């Protein structure tokens, strides 16, 4: 019997999530063809390319499954975007011969008040915040043993000095609500192109993001299919190498590219770098022991238990993001 492309090693180690990339690519491509052509009866796929490894792998899979001529890539910079995101996204499109378009959403976001609303909330904790300033939100690590993650607002003044601010809940929620306009506006643009082409929209979350609710509802969480949601981030990198995703993309640290200050996903949401988070999540899912997990991740047993608690907490807190609209009674 041939092993499953997602079969794993029995012992937890850095190799625990190794996969047969070729077999897994074929399996995903077959599923994508069936979903797009038979289940949804669409001609192709639209994808927002961010210059990150997840969207790049999904674009490569789409081209492999349906042909590059049936994939449309969209690049959607805004006022806070890192210019590298656009250049890397375009490099990916070129590597896989994808047609695409640049849709700068900065003016649309400004017209809706995205930036001004965010800045108004920031000024509740730092009245001087304005032109020339930059910001990001970071969380405390659950490894610190505080029991829950605290969000901190980091501000950089025009002279380069940085300050950290605790936020009232209303300020935090207001900043996040304004910032979430970015993901929702991008998704609106993706569906515009999907509608005009009779294409489906391709979602790009990996398993860690999907499991932990690291997405905006009706924003980057909205899609018609999500072909890598079962793959750990470590496995996405294996697929990226196999499919020939440009090395510059594979070397780039995972980033939200949402805030005007550079911010990693680890700073904003996850407790650890993705490779160790993957192992902790896999160990929890498979019911492996805390001692084995600690050895594989180079954490203490107390730290592993804190990471697992954080995983459970995020699953509970973000469960509503996964729910379809609730009905009083079934309709279909």
From Swiss-Prot:
Binding site for ATP: 48-55, 204, 233, 255
Pathway: Cofactor biosynthesis; NAD(+) biosynthesis; NAD(+) from deamido-NAD(+) (ammonia route): step 1/1
Documented EC number(s): 6.3.1.5
GO molecular function annotation: ATP binding; glutaminase activity; metal ion binding; NAD+ synthase (glutamine-hydrolyzing) activity; NAD+ synthase activity
Recorded catalytic activity of this chain's protein: deamido-NAD(+) + NH4(+) + ATP = AMP + diphosphate + NAD(+) + H(+)
Sequence positions that bind deamido-NAD(+): 184, 217, 224
Keywords: ATP-binding, Ligase, Magnesium, Metal-binding, NAD, Nucleotide-binding
Any one of the GO CC terms: cytoplasm
UniProt key word Nucleotide-binding: yes
A single GO BP: NAD biosynthetic process
Binding annotation for Mg(2+): 54, 209
InterPro entries for this protein: NAD/GMP_synthase, NAD_synthase, NH(3)-dep_NAD(+)_synth, Rossmann-like_a/b/a_fold
Superkingdom of this protein's organism: Bacteria
SUPFAM superfamilies: Adenine nucleotide alpha hydrolases-like (SSF52402)
Family from the record: Belongs to the NAD synthetase family.
Role description: Catalyzes the ATP-dependent amidation of deamido-NAD to form NAD. Uses ammonia as a nitrogen source.
Oligomer status and interactors: Homodimer.
NCBIfam families: nadE (TIGR00552), PRK00876.1 (NF002048)
Name of the protein: NH(3)-dependent NAD(+) synthetase
Organism (species): Rhizobium rhizogenes (strain K84 / ATCC BAA-868) (Agrobacterium radiobacter)
Phylogenetic classification of the source organism: Bacteria, Pseudomonadati, Pseudomonadota, Alphaproteobacteria, Hyphomicrobiales
Gene name of the record: nadE
